[in-house]
């Protein structure tokens, strides 16, 4: 990640533009989640987005609301469960502007079932003006 201020500014512009797929290359999951939470809070305060539209997934917490840290339902801890939750969330009542942060994603560098599922999720996010943010670390 570049310096935090530049990264936060770029992330804010991407979220305002509703870019459907954002990749953050980082090994610092906690710092990146804090930055996303800070940027998201700014966007909520400025009226761009709703605080009920930001979710994150970690292996230890499962899916949770990024602002309240409250677990969301019985989603399980796997990234595939988080992806299924996101699909349901985007389809539910045609909710727009939902954001899901996936901190652990399977290898999507090749053509396989996992990469196809992520592609389908991103396509749906694009249709519903949602955003999927994934953390990537190739080391």
Describe the residue ranges of each PLM region.
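ATP/nucleotide-binding catalytic cores
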Residues: 1-139
């Amino acid at each position: 990640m570049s310096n935090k201020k530049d990264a936060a500014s770029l992330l804010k512009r991407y979220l305002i533009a509703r870019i459907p797929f954002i990749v953050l290359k980082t090994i610092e999951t906690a710092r990146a989640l804090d930055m996303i939470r800070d940027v998201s809070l700014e966007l909520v305060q400025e009226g761009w987005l709703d605080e009920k539209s930001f979710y994150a997934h970690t292996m230890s917490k499962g899916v949770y609301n990024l602002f309240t840290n409250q677990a969301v339902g019985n989603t399980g801890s796997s990234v595939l469960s988080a992806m299924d939750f996101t699909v349901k969330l985007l389809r539910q009542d045609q909710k727009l502007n939902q954001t899901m942060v996936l901190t652990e994603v399977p290898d999507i560098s090749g053509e396989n079932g996992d990469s196809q599922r992520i592609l389908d999720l991103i396509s749906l996010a694009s249709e519903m003006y949602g955003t999927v943010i994934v953390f990537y670390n190739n080391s």
